[in-house]
Amino acid sequence: MKTSVAARLRVGAVPFLNARPLVFGLEQGIARERVELQYDVPSVLASRMAAGDLDVALLPTIELARIPGLVVVPGLGISARGPAASVILVCKKPLAEVKSVALDPDSRTSNALVQVLFRETWKTRPLFSMGASDLAASLLKHDAAVRIGDKALFEPLPAGTEAVDLGAAWTRARGLPFVFAVWAARSGVVDREIYDALHQSKRQGLRVLDLIALDYTWRGIQDPEKSLDYLTRNMSYRLGAPELASLGSFLASARSAGVLEHDAEVALAAFGKAAGRPIAPARTRARALAGRVER
């Protein structure tokens, strides 16, 4: 008996190039009877997940500490060890002289990351406020602006500005990759079939990165060489021990910086003997996070 459309899991993903390898197989029909894909920017996915409008989402990692009752699908994420290319701070002044920063309305994690970096790495305390979708409008009122996704990757920088890569800044400071997003779900939603489907979707996507890059277009811009270089050199889709250590460190630092109001408890979904590792902070003196595994 076929699963009805109403019974499908509502699965949210971002409409950015960096997510294409993860959703490629789902778009080709993997778990078609179980999954209904929906697309939106990270900040909207987070709001919809918090409101109960999604069952599974490619969620900004900072939201794991804000939305209760979520579990992380083991082994899958969007991360960068070094330059991320699509997560930048566009500056009109040197970092030491930046007094005001426009946050990206599409972002949650990168907005938190820039606040952690200013506090713990760059040792300054600029004012942060929500910026505009238009970069020029944000820079009219601020010394710097956060940009994420395809607009950060493909949009030319305004004259007289420089870009600071936030992924590279994190890795230089911590020696760890930075995890921008993970597949997160409501507890009890992800069964073995969905777990396998998400992993199979990624495997299919990674096998055809050249085709993904060739087909991808953003606002009329099609640059297969740049897209392929980005997918193969900047982005990583694993969620192993280094990524989990980094995630714990980031959430603890966000708590210390006042970005989070409380310590985070993050759980990895597990199925029988496939239990994942609890997430714990690394290289930080912030209070320990409570790691647990859903069984």
Residue ranges and their predicted role:
Residues 189-257:
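Secondary-structure end/capping motifs
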Residues 76-135, 163, 169-171:
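A conserved helix-loop-strand patch within extracytoplasmic ligand-binding domains
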Residues 25, 87-95, 100, 178-192:
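A bilobed periplasmic-binding-protein/Venus flytrap-type ligand-binding module shared by bacterial periplasmic
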Residues 50-59, 123-125, 140-147:
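Alpha-to-beta junction loops
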Residues 79-87, 157-187, 261-281:
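Periplasmic-binding protein-like
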Residues 17-18, 41-42, 53-65, 76, ...:
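Beta->alpha turn/N-cap motifs
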Residues 36-47, 124-141:
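Short helix-initiation/N-cap motifs at beta->coil->alpha
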Residues 130-216:
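Pocket-lining segment of extracytoplasmic ligand-binding domains
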